[in-house]
Amino acid sequence: MRKWLIFLLIAAVAGLSACSTSGNTTVSDDLVLVEGGAFKTSKSSYSDKNVTLSDFYIGKYEVTQKQWMDVMGDNPSGFKGEERPVERVTWYDAIEYCNARSIKENLKPYYTIDKETTDPDNKNENDNIKWTVTINEGANGYRLPTGAEWEYAASGGQKSQNFTYSGSNNPDEVAWYWMNAGEKPLTGDWNWPAIENNRNQTKPVGQQKANELGIYDMSGNVREWCWEWHSHPETPENTWRISKGGGWVSSVNTAEISYPGKFDANGLGPDQGLRVVRSK
């Protein structure tokens, strides 16, 4: 009888643990609810594709260095500052962060990461990692946005005012990019020596104007990883992952909502960060 009681106690504890890992319905206060629907803007690359999205949550800000350190225990960023966006993170780093944060917050991880099996779909000759990453359908944990979700949120969702950039037609109101991310404004054509001499760098999140949904920095500051492969008729399939929004070193056109950004999944750009999403 005693053995059965011990067994039942262990089973009950295991059951509670399983529930705590996947049954947490609390939503972090740094997430914004995005009401789903069809695109209201004409400035998205998905505007004419009859895409309809479900409700989801997205980070009000890019993932900060403090948020990254609290979960991962290190800080790969070149421009240090707790409230600056984390940068120099690969797509694989971003996937691992999503799962680790999910576990930390007692959510079910959205991804299964197989580091021993080379992804057969990955055609990028420069990618020396090529982990196989699959989705756990129905999981409530953190994840990267799809390209469509990213552009939908950046354009203001159902509240869109049809801006070119996320929250404005004037990039200087909403974006940190090569002309305004340094000690003084720059003019003329994109120029790396001028950028370097001007001490351009990332800025603490949330300093520019928010977009229609109250989301900050979806244009500029750092580029943001998305989940799927970049797809374009003039580029090879399954080679780059989508990277959106442009960054502090980028030309202004990359900050446009529709700009088709891409990057090697193992790339460590000084303007490459992320923003998280959760399904509703």
From Swiss-Prot:
It is found in: Cell membrane. Transmembrane segments: none annotated. Residues 1-18 form the signal peptide. A lipid is attached at residue 19 (S-diacylglycerol cysteine). The keyword Cell inner membrane does not apply. It is a lipid-anchor. Its main location: membrane. The keyword S-adenosyl-L-methionine does not apply. GO terms for biological process: protein folding. PROSITE patterns: PROKAR_LIPOPROTEIN. Keywords: Cell membrane, Chaperone, Lipoprotein, Membrane, Palmitate, Signal. Pfam families: FGE-sulfatase. One of its GO terms (cellular component) is plasma membrane. GO terms for molecular function: formylglycine-generating oxidase activity; protein folding chaperone. A lipid is attached at residue 19 (N-palmitoyl cysteine). It comes from the Bacteria. Is required for the expression of the adjacently encoded xylanase Xyn11E in an active form. LppX seems to act as a specific chaperone necessary for the correct folding of the xylanase during secretion across the cytoplasmic membrane. This is Chaperone protein LppX. It comes from Paenibacillus barcinonensis. The gene is lppX.
